[in-house]
Amino acid sequence: MTSSPVSRVVYNGKRTSSPRSPPSSSEIFTPAHEENVRFIYEAWQGVERDLRGQVPGGERGLVEEYVEKVPNPSLKTFKPIDLSDLKRRSTQDAKKS
């Protein structure tokens, strides 16, 4: 078995407030789940903001995209999916049944 580098999100600790979405009547989430989702959302918004603020060719910024030097052969056939679309489809399928 070969080991390959693991990509990870690096969070710089900045926190901003974000609007809370109204709860859906069919979905009940624990406070811990909501906090995890909020943390990931805020962290990703910070990453996107930092990426937009970086000057191409300038000095190294806060955010750096990780790219493997040697691609993992197991991922050769990997096709990215839109998670929002997947959730939408699974929700529609659940309502049909």
From Swiss-Prot:
Acetylation recorded as keyword: yes
Motif window: PXDLS motif: 80-84
A Pfam entry, by short name: FAM195
GO CC annotation terms, alphabetical: cytoplasm; cytoplasmic stress granule; nucleus
Gene Ontology biological-process entries: regulation of epithelial to mesenchymal transition
Subcellular location: Nucleus; Cytoplasm, Stress granule
Keywords on record: Acetylation, Cytoplasm, Nucleus, Phosphoprotein
Keyword Phosphoprotein listed: yes
Modified residues (Phosphoserine): 21, 24
InterPro entries reported in the protein's UniProt record: MCRIP
Oligomeric form and interacting partners: Interacts (unphosphorylated form, via the PXDLS motif) with CTBP1, competitively inhibiting CTBP-ZEB1 interaction. Interacts with CTBP2. Interacts with MCRIP2. Interacts with DDX6.
UniProt name for this protein: Mapk-regulated corepressor-interacting protein 1
Organism, as annotated: Homo sapiens (Human)
High-level lineage: Eukaryota, Metazoa, Chordata, Craniata, Vertebrata
